[in-house]
Amino acid sequence: MSAPPERILLFRSGRHLATALAALRAASPGCDITVVATPAAAPALEQNGIDAGHRLLYDRTPFFQPWPFLTSAAGARAWAGRFDRVCVLWNDPDGAGQVNVDHTALVVSPLGFTAITADGSLIVHRTTTIVRREAARAVSSIGIAMLIGLCLFLPARLLRPFRS
């Protein structure tokens, strides 16, 4: 008995949709891909052969935002779909300008998502890695603030007896 095909939810269709679909199909042959898009992207979905059964049209806001998506019909269908993998199509290689889409993907898949770049590269983002990186940044910021405080206030405290 063969395993069922991987069910993939792809956020954000765009000019690189064909590349993203090809990359996903190469990485997971026979996968079942459902695309979440805004109504403005419907022609791109048609052009790439995405049928109505594999589309989730999000029409609550013109851009992806986590809370409105979660409370929309498309969000309910995404949650109910129990997808094996959640992916985000990045137009920029490093994901610049994609934060709302990334956060929306994390709402559906709290453990992480796979980013697909315009050249078809797959980049796995895990929530634990993101949280660890942000915690390290917070700790280093606190450490730097303490060092600056010591450098500024310690000399003033030591020189206090010598002031007139």
Label for each model-derived stretch:
Residues 116-164:
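Active-site-proximal region of nucleotide-activated glycan assembly enzymes
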